[in-house]
Amino acid sequence: MITNGSITYYHKTLDNNKLPVWNRYVFESVWHFGGKGSNINKGYENANDVNIRIPMEYVEDKNIFTIGDIISIGINPPISKTTDLLYTEFYNVTSVTINEYGNNPHVHLGGK
């Protein structure tokens, strides 16, 4: 699979006090398309949508991917709250598809 960048994936869990904890995962060889200002066929309706494919060879635990998690473009530091990402390009995960079969097994993430 051709790759064109890296992402930082923040998976949300809750601690004993029911407060959010953001677990950080860095994927350095991913394919991503779209994002802020990308407007090819659907105009501004889908201008902030992003699609990311992570080759399965780089995924240690496919169960970390959940709708509502956060994708940040590039390699970014750990966070304790979502406002820590204020000055980075980030997206909320809106879809997760695990494609384990075929020529290019990968995790496909959609975000807004």
Which ranges hold each PLM region?
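Active-site-proximal polar cores
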Residues: 1-27
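Short, conserved turn/kink motifs that form compact alpha/beta structural patches or helix kinks used as
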Residues: 20-112
